[in-house]
Amino acid sequence: LESIRDIPFGTFVIDAGWYLPENCGWCNATGDWEQSRTLFPRGIKAAADMIRAQGMHAGLWFEFEVAGRDSKAFSAQDMLLARDGVPLTSKNRRFFDLRKPAVQAYVQEKMCDFLRENGFEYVKIDYNDNIGMGCDGAESLGEGGRQIAEESLRWLDRLKSSVPGIVIEN
């Protein structure tokens, strides 16, 4: 950070991989959202504090709707979207069912509370996959898909309420 101090960056974003366990790649580790103590031995809050001390806004990457194959969340079938009773899987990812109260509590803790408690003022939210033609849990697959899209938008509102003033990039 010292080396870029005089460059007029407004925001410094810690990108994908901040949660990286030592045994897998960043893409397959999404979903558990536990900060890496290897990458951030003093904790990610210390990194955010250092960013702000250099006069920049601290930002963090999230893809809050998915669980990668190597995460514990990938196997938490009661929290995941399904189609025809089978967890909806796209390559190495599954999707959280954002309609469920347990998932809402999980995302609140892992994303919203985490961002607020660690002093992040900016979040970069990727949506690198999609659920296709829909999911179970409604009168049709399409209606299930519509409900999930609507719930994703509600999460942006929840995020703004949980972290006042946060800038959201998508």
Where do the protein language model's features map onto the residues?
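Short, solvent-exposed loop/turn and secondary-structure capping segments
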Residues: C24-G25, E63, R69-A73
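Extracytoplasmic/secreted cell-surface and envelope-processing proteins
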Residues: E22, D70, G132-G134
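Catalytic domains of carbohydrate-active enzymes, especially glycoside hydrolases
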Residues: E2-P21, E117-G119
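Active-site beta-loop-alpha junctions enriched in small/polar residues
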Residues: F12, A16-Y19, E63-A67, N128-N130
